[in-house]
Amino acid sequence: MKLSSDAILPKAMTEGAAGLDLFCLNRTAVTSSRFSSKATIIHTGLAMELPKGYYAELVLRSSTGRDTKLRLANQVGIIDADYRGEIMLYVENLGDHLEIIDKGQRIAQMLIHKIEEVEIVEATSSLSDTERGLESGSTGKGTGRKTTRKQQNI
């Protein structure tokens, strides 16, 4: 739903695009985070009603990340199916200079996902051992170490 007549509906820019591009509603200046402790709000002028069982994920366009020092303040935005407010992006400028986002500029993408229902069940015994074990951030590094919970006395 357009909240402003100037809003541009999200659009898949190519036939195989996974995300829908989001457009900036107004020309917006994003101050360097060196000079501001608050994120800048980028308005889209849009609101939506997702079907029950779905959510939207907001991510920066890769070209925005490549060409600027702008980042989403929360790294990724999540829009729940029961949210009815404006779709907004909270942006930080990690660079040294002011960044201008022009009206109508594509800055982020919205991906729509189906929620998979899961049931969380507390383990009452132990978890199975795997080749990776408990090594965090170790895949492909060939540490050769395998730690189990028994070895850690957890």
Regions of interest found by a model, annotated:
Residues 1-154:
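DUTPase catalytic domain/fold
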